[in-house]
């Protein structure tokens, strides 16, 4: 049983960097090289949210140490953000981040240029 727990622990520790960094880095490079703008939006949104999550963790570190499932919850949330089936990063960006930036005047509305 100890070996099983050790193996699961090691897998859990390895899953974080793979899900949070390696796959998004690879997918971001592929997105930049593709002609589509849709995947660019997904990965820019992901890096914005991941940066915010990391900054929040730094600020709340002493509190998060008391939450035993924090790392697992973060791993599941980030997996939802990055998996192409869900496109969670683009969803959160469009529904939360963009709206808050507009609300506080940080993001100006797009102005359509008319042909002369």
Swiss-Prot record:
<dbReference type="GO" id="GO:0009414">
    <property type="term" value="P:response to water deprivation"/>
</dbReference>
<dbReference type="Pfam" id="PF03134">
    <property type="entry name" value="TB2_DP1_HVA22"/>
</dbReference>
<keyword id="KW-0812">Transmembrane</keyword>
<feature type="transmembrane region" description="Helical">
    <location>
        <begin position="63"/>
        <end position="83"/>
    </location>
</feature>
<keyword id="KW-0472">Membrane</keyword>
<feature type="transmembrane region" description="Helical">
    <location>
        <begin position="12"/>
        <end position="32"/>
    </location>
</feature>
<dbReference type="GO" id="GO:0009409">
    <property type="term" value="P:response to cold"/>
</dbReference>
<dbReference type="GO" id="GO:0009737">
    <property type="term" value="P:response to abscisic acid"/>
</dbReference>
<dbReference type="InterPro" id="IPR004345">
    <property type="entry name" value="TB2_DP1_HVA22"/>
</dbReference>
<keyword id="KW-0346">Stress response</keyword>
<dbReference type="GO" id="GO:0042538">
    <property type="term" value="P:hyperosmotic salinity response"/>
</dbReference>
<comment type="similarity">
    <text>Belongs to the DP1 family.</text>
</comment>
<dbReference type="GO" id="GO:0016020">
    <property type="term" value="C:membrane"/>
</dbReference>
<keyword id="KW-1133">Transmembrane helix</keyword>
<feature type="transmembrane region" description="Helical">
    <location>
        <begin position="42"/>
        <end position="62"/>
    </location>
</feature>
<protein>
    <recommendedName>
        <fullName>HVA22-like protein e</fullName>
    </recommendedName>
</protein>
